[in-house]
Amino acid sequence: MNNQKSKFDQKWKLIRGQSMEWFSLLAEHDLKKVDKAEDKQDKFVTILQVKYGYTRQQAAEEINRHWVAFHRASKIAA
């Protein structure tokens, strides 16, 4: 899990850039909370739980689903 979290932290700027498009209920102040968090993945998942009523598992799956789609689209565009 720590390896996943460090990958999330490494990709946070890319994820952050897409987050408001992926999750329309997010606002800039939500993303700033994640920016300041020591464990960015945990904070982001928690915010999605609050905003969307997801379980932790659902929030993680939604992040992954959007990330995979974004990554595939980036490869196709390249």
Regions inferred by a protein language model and the residue ranges of each:
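Intrinsically disordered, low-complexity, hydrophilic segments
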Residues: 1-78
